[in-house]
Amino acid sequence: EAHWPADAPLSGLVVTRYLHGLPTRRIEVVEASHPLPDGRGEAAALRMLDMSRQLGPDDLLLVLISGGGSSLLAAPVEGVTLKELRQVTKALLHAGASIHDINTVRKHLTRLSGGQLAQTAQAAHGLALIISDVVGDDPGSIASGPCAPDASSCVDALDQLQRLRITPPAGVRHHLEACAAGRLPDTPKPGNACFARMENRVIACAHGSLMAAVRYFEQHGIPALLLSDKVGGDAQSVARQHAALVHALARRQTLALISGGETTV
């Protein structure tokens, strides 16, 4: 807002976690739930879609994306209730699914994920500025890729649920099966015309942050060891491994151990 010309039109909507909102003048801020979606996030997602539909060829859609957007903007597709979306999300988390597996399912159950925001706003110029929290920095995986092509399918979502032995709620199963059979449209894929005027740009990632931490410790005379920027798996298992490493190394020297990635809680 501070850097936008005062006489230029500006409107917008930001959705963030509870207790993370900041005062604004021209852009509305809504707080919602993470990691399980709630009604405030659903309502905000529907409003965001409505705002995007009103954009024309002379408009610019600026999308600021960071991790957590999948839950904060979780408006279920028609035929799936918010309760059912919460149930399947909770089941995926409890099953130890990777963030890739979770996103594969959620992209096909919500209205903005998997490139659907770009599809809705395709009349306008679009620029998505992305802070990555995922291994590999794929725009399609960050916040479930609202502005990026989706390489996965409803068949993939069903396969993930079956592999994890999750029995989805009826609405979820019916939607995914209808989509897999071609009776409902899937998410927009690479090459879809809706992405012709949309640019996805990763402006910050975990590796850059980790290297900044390494430099900070070294500048203060503390040796730093970057273990990995691709840590994944169950959070408890990863924590035990890190604790064991700290216990073994701390006996001999002062050392900062640094790692990044995305674990499943």
Specify the residue positions occupied by each region the protein language model found.
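Glycine-rich oxoanion-binding loops at beta->alpha junctions
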Residues: 13-57, 101, 105-106
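Short, acidic/small-residue loops that bind anionic groups at enzyme active sites
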Residues: 10-14, 78-103
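General beta-strand structural signal in soluble alpha/beta enzymes
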Residues: 14, 31, 63-65, 99-104, ...
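Accessory alpha-helical/coil subdomains and C-terminal extensions
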Residues: 124-127, 149-241, 245-248
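Short beta-strand segments
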Residues: 13-16, 62-67, 93, 128-134, ...
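A glycine/threonine-rich phosphate-anchoring loop and its flanking beta-alpha core
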Residues: 93, 99-166, 176
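C-terminal non-catalytic interaction/assembly regions of soluble proteins
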Residues: 1, 241-265
